[in-house]
Amino acid sequence: LAEHGARIVVNDLGGAVDGTGHSDAADSGVEEIRAAGGEAVANKASVSDREGARSIVETAVREYGTVDIVVNNAGILRDKSFKKMTLDEWDLVINVHLNGSAYVTWHAWPIMYEKNFGRVIFTSSVSGILGSFGQSNYGAAKMGMVGLMNNLSREGASHNIHVNCLSPGAATRMTASVPGSDIDADNPE
């Protein structure tokens, strides 16, 4: 997006895959964008916190005057079978993926609605559509994003707000421990 002139708010709460510690992932993303000639600022608020979500949108408005595009891509995993999962692990994943996406979008929505332009992208997952062992919380959150996208795309259409959902399979540092993650997608045999 930055290569095409978008001015970016890079949001990342930081931390290791298990949520411990601290990282400067948002700062690293900003540095990478700036090194390539783009404009970016960091925000380290949690999308799962309503005020944190508000601060992400407020950062865009303060720095760039508006918000045109929201990419809901925050993620966290707490993979366990449903039987072994705690309700806190359930809530954490639902809050980051589904509620966090709704919160950030909710804060940006009036801005987009008022100016009759906006783009919202949800990053869902094939785990929401097809299911994946040990990911009931994740799959439910990701399928919830599809439902939210379907409804918001209807609500935003008359105001030139396009809402879409990507549902990729993933190979990231968070998915390295997921059963079956060692399959080579280019050579699945």
What are these regions (language model features)?
Residues 23, 44-58, 87:
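The beta1-alpha1 cofactor-binding region of Rossmann-like NAD(H)/NADP(H)-dependent oxidoreductases
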Residues 125:
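Residue(s) in the substrate-gating loop at a strand-loop-helix junction
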Residues 36-39, 59-72, 78-81, 117, ...:
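A glycine-rich helix->loop->beta "capping" turn
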Residues 81-82, 86-94:
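Substrate-binding pocket helix/loop in short-chain dehydrogenase/reductase
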Residues 105, 141:
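Active-site helix of classical SDR
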Residues 3-4, 112-114, 130, 146, ...:
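Active-site-adjacent segment of SDR/Rossmann-fold oxidoreductases
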Residues 4-27:
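Conserved glycine-rich Rossmann-like NAD(P)H-binding loop of the short-chain dehydrogenase/reductase
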